[in-house]
Amino acid sequence: MNLTTNGFQRNLPSSLGNMEMIEFLDISHNSFHGKLPRSFLKGCDSLIVLKLSHKKLSEEVFPEASNFFSILELSMDNNLFTGKIGRGLQSLRSLIMLDISNNNLSGVIPSWFDQLQDLHSLQISNNLLEGEVPISLFNMSSLQLLALSANSLSGDLPQAISGYGALKVLLLRDNNLSGVIPDTLLGKNIIVLDLRNNRLSGNIPEFINTQYIRILLLRGNNLTGSIPRRLCAVRSIHLLDLANNKLNGSIPSCLRNASLGLGRGGYIRRLFIIITFFLWEHLSVHFSNLCSCKMGLLSIMS
């Protein structure tokens, strides 16, 4: 059932729980508000896809267990949910995609997420979460997209990680992460790594195991030293942003044929397009304290 983008208002009707055979329900982009009815969480046990995005739903997210044992995709982003991430989500063992981003969720990221072994995509960006990123998230065998940007997460990035599981997209921008970037952070499958606007320090690591990285965003940290020449060997890279760090030295000559992509069309505002479609083909190098050299098409902006 698709009821998206209508003018529905008021609370979600408790009668939703009577639709025991429904498998797909999308009521996004309406004006429903209030909390999820308990009858709804206990009914609808055939649901496979549930989309409740862009509404005004509030209170806690799944504070208790539901009967959504078959659900594969759950989208509850862009609401007004508050409190901790509910333990009711822990029972959704079939989940492949969970999006609870753009809410007012607080507390820490639960360690039990690693029990959702079929989870491919976990999006919790733009909330009020704090504490460290659980190391268990990086060891999940199926997780390919992990989005934790724009929270108040702190602490060091995990060091003792081997390969970072199946991760392809890791988004951690706009947090309070500190320490050095581990050499092991970029597993062999990583395509997008976004660590912008944290408090990371030390040198840019060599990223020895990287094969497929397309987008590497390290802007707005406290990185020092020079650009590692090993980046020259990463031929798949499309976008590199090292702006607003404390780098020095010269730009490797291997970048002489790169063209500047930073700022064209406002890439920061449209980064979701890059991540989704990988359409950008420009290498962005924009930072201070580097030798301003003429190298083919490469432009350096302060």
Curated annotation (Swiss-Prot):
The keyword Repeat applies. Coiled coil: none annotated. SUPFAM superfamilies: L domain-like. Keywords: Leucine-rich repeat, Receptor, Repeat. LRR repeats lie at residues 1-19, 20-43, 45-70, 72-91, 92-115, 116-140, 142-164, 166-188, 190-211, 213-234, 235-258. InterPro entries: Leu-rich_rpt (IPR001611), LRR_dom_sf (IPR032675), RLP_Defense_Trigger (IPR051502). Belongs to the RLP family. PANTHER family: RECEPTOR-LIKE PROTEIN 13, RECEPTOR-LIKE PROTEIN 14. This is Putative receptor-like protein 16. The gene is RLP16.
